[in-house]
Amino acid sequence: MPAAYDLLALGAAACWALGSLISVGPSRHLGAFAFSRWRMLLVALMLWVATLTLSPWGGWQSLPPQSWWPLALSGLVGIFVGDVALFAAMNRLGPRRAGVLFATHAAFSAVLGFVVLGERIGLQAALGGVLTLAGVMTAILLGRRHDDAHAWEADRGHVGAGVLLALLAALCQALASLIVKPVMITPGVDPIAASAVRVSVATLAQFALLASGFAAARPTQRPTFAVLVQTGVNGFVAMGMGMTLVLVALKNGDVGTVAILSSVSPVLLLPLLWLRLGRPPAPAAWLGAGLTVVGTALILLR
């Protein structure tokens, strides 16, 4: 019987897959910094309302004073730096190639969880993790058809910079999970309130960067109503829901296992891209998807 936190991590992966599909247009319209800033602001407002009115876990009162600093640091590392780096990479490489590089956050998380937190996983789960990551990378690396000339697959800017930005985003995601894990295992901590703190701190950092005059923080184009709606929907699905599901999963799950299961989002993205672009991925992509399914099953049934 799969553990609840495993299913929550897979749910986060589904949210991120859908969110990445929604993000391409508004991210390229506004630029990585402006898109992230608008997204964080909208999500922060949503999470504050949810914490004050809807959360079943106790709201702000559930957060002990000593939890605020690690939550703030986790937000700065994982959301402020990591989020911007990921969308900057996506703008340069497209969602497919940025996704395969970002999937390395699972490997970073497993190593950091072992070294820093002393987390151990069994042989079956380890084999499942290897197959899952291999499947994700196979599906994306070999998932592009030779005749695919869609704008989402085009290179924009320096490819090497895009690769480094995607790897930076992956490392930031792993570090943020490591930082926030001790907070989430504290009994009674509200994951929605914790998410609100993380996103609010990252939002303040974004606006401070804009106020400093940093040129890249300015939007490349003025936001339209349609772009803001897409940004808000993306934020609700990927950050509001996806990130909160990960925090709930971290209450009982290991950092490495949660990261591995949540990294399958690029494979879940394959059928969504098929629907969106009107053509199936290359046959090798389905081989990768098959490996991911087998690996995920080994983890769930460990």
Model-identified regions with their sequence ranges:
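Juxtamembrane boundary at the C-terminal end of a transmembrane helix
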Residues: K251-N252, A297-R302
